[in-house]
């Protein structure tokens, strides 16, 4: 899947600027019966991600706690500012509450970014990894797990935050 995403991004980069923008606008034009659209992009600042960010109202950045990931946040928020996109916040992903390092890094992140760190954390879970193999959401695969419930809570928190804007 990663090599396929790389190929798509590489092909996108070869398109003329106006065609890139038109294609991204098409993707972002969705059925108006929906209030929100979530686009999951590769974790790289390519022209594709920059175009999508530029045309988005708010951007939430998932982060797996680790020193390098936290050190990369200023680059991401700087890129968002350059695209005039609103930084909705960080979503802590693959969080292990039993790991003292994760707990310390979460506290550091909260001290650094304050309310830009969402309260909902997505726990590390094999269920999520396994659900991808079956092309199911975590909720469809095993709806009673903590990870599946965390995604429900995350959606509610994001909707609440966007409603406050």
Predicted segments — roles?
Residues 29-126:
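Conserved catalytic-core segment of NTP-binding enzymes
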